[in-house]
Each structure stands twice: as C-alpha cells, then as structure tokens.
C-alpha cells in the first residue's frame, strides 16, 4: 500500500477512540485498504458499494468537524493527506 496510516492503538484511551478525528482516521485506513483491493479486483461491485458508504460517512464526519473545530479539521486533512470539503 502506498499510504501506511498506522497508530499505536494501545496508547489511545477509550474516550479518544470515540472522537471524530479518530473515526475519520479509521475510515481513511479502510478507504486505503479497499483502494488497494480494487487494484486487483476491479469488478468487485459489492465492495465498491461499501467503499461509497465509507466515503459518505467520512464526508459527513469531516463536515461536522469543519463546523465545530476548524483548526482540528485543517490539521487532520494535512496529517492524513486527503482533500478537504468542496467550498461553494
């Protein structure tokens, strides 16, 4: 995989695991893994549907973080190397 986004999960408390930032981090890891999977299995349409659901959930969480804590949103976007939300 091109991006390895791993974190030592034992050092993270249960409260931090429920945070929006951590949820976005976990969803981004799943997106990276599925993207790698699709390079080998391009016609796996059921997994593509799952990927779209994950992307939708991540987008909603990013929108929430954008509204509530913009500084944290910007830091997370840079740290994960993903695009931010579209600006209208």
Curated annotation (Swiss-Prot):
Gene Ontology terms describing biological process: translation
Subcellular location: Plastid, Chloroplast
Main subcellular localisation: plastid
Gene3D superfamilies listed in its UniProt record: S15/NS1, RNA-binding
Keyword field: Chloroplast, Plastid, Ribonucleoprotein, Ribosomal protein
A Pfam cross-reference name: Ribosomal_S15
GO cellular component: chloroplast; ribonucleoprotein complex; ribosome
GO molecular function, one term: structural constituent of ribosome
SUPFAM superfamilies in the cross-refs: S15/NS1 RNA-binding domain
Keyword tRNA processing belongs to the record: no
Family the entry assigns: Belongs to the universal ribosomal protein uS15 family.
Subunit (UniProt): Part of the 30S ribosomal subunit.
Protein's recorded name: Small ribosomal subunit protein uS15c
